[in-house]
Amino acid sequence: MPDTELEIEYSQAVRDHRAAHSRLVMLLRRMAMESLGDVVPGASSIAAVGEFNEDGIPTLRIQRVFDAEGRVLFDVDVGHSDREVEDAVDFVDTEYVDVLIDLAPGDYFGSVVID
């Protein structure tokens, strides 16, 4: 049986891990929005879809980017005439948004909104 000191240390480590996890999720969401905001002025929210890809790996992919009034600024099905926008969406997908589904799969499968 673990001694009391070990149980206390373990409990603290669990609390620290949960706090760090929550902070990382919040920072990933902010990084995604601010990165898109650099190339899509007025970007306020992202509509994304979380699913398993053909290799069985969970992915979260941006479908649309909206402004604060709900107007579509980017739609993956339409694309964008500015290659910088397309590149930014691809970067945000792999560097920030995909990490969200790894960290909290229950929150990011199916249709989700990130703001």
Cite the ranges covered by each PLM segment.
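A contiguous, surface-oriented mixed alpha/beta subdomain in the mid-to-C-terminal portion of proteins
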Residues: P41-E51
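Detector for the mature cores of small, proteolytically processed
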Residues: D3, E7, F52-D115
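Contiguous, amphipathic alpha-helical segments that mediate oligomerization or scaffolding
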Residues: D3-A43
